[in-house]
Amino acid sequence: MNAASTVVKPVSAQSIPVQETFGPTIQGEGYWAGAVVDFIRLYGCPVGCPWCDTGYADGGPQLPRAVRTFSDLILELKSPRVVISGGEPFIHAALPALVEAIGRTGRAVAIETSGAFWQPVPDWAWVTLSPKEHVSPRHPVNPQMWRRANEVKIVIAGGAELDVYRRFLPPGVPVSLQPEWEARERTLPLTLELLKAHPRYRLSVQLHKYLQVP
């Protein structure tokens, strides 16, 4: 399956498939960990990470979905910062228009992505690239995404992940290493050792899971 065939076209120009929305809560991962945010979790992801914590390891056919208008989504927002996650947000052709619509309300927007797909989102939007090519070789990171990313977050499950991506990491872009949650008794010590060897990088610990908030 190529990237072009995976892009989901909107039912209307101002709508998009949504799995769930929630907030205010805190961002638990990456550069903005601890910030108060609202989440818009878009439906759908073909990447198939085996440890996916949002239900898409098998493609997510059982997950809830609803086509929502931008205006309805914006009415629900309560925080100054909005995180658009998934699933994989960049499979949706309507993503750039959604980001623009939220931006017109004066809110900051961050987008979480595997980087396998590309849409030209506004320059002011924050893009968190969490590459998954090492577990899904059929979905390599789009080269444009390495140049566009505002931060890179690498999930550490076996320890070799950093070696896979280190040559692609853009100079000056914040990089965080995040231990895979389900095996954290093993992956947290492993991640700490990697950080000692690469002290320019930072630790991401999925703070929301430790605090047991959405």
Curated annotation (Swiss-Prot):
Pfam families xrefs: Radical_SAM
Keyword Transmembrane: no
Binding site for S-adenosyl-L-methionine: G87, S130, P131, K132
Cofactors (names): [4Fe-4S] cluster; S-adenosyl-L-methionine; Mg(2+)
Catalytic reaction list: 6-carboxy-5,6,7,8-tetrahydropterin + H(+) = 7-carboxy-7-deazaguanine + NH4(+)
Subunit structure, interactors included: Homodimer.
HAMAP family, sorted: QueE
Family statement drawn from the similarity comment of this UniProt entry: Belongs to the radical SAM superfamily. 7-carboxy-7-deazaguanine synthase family.
Name this protein carries in UniProt: 7-carboxy-7-deazaguanine synthase
Organism of derivation: Gloeobacter violaceus (strain ATCC 29082 / PCC 7421)
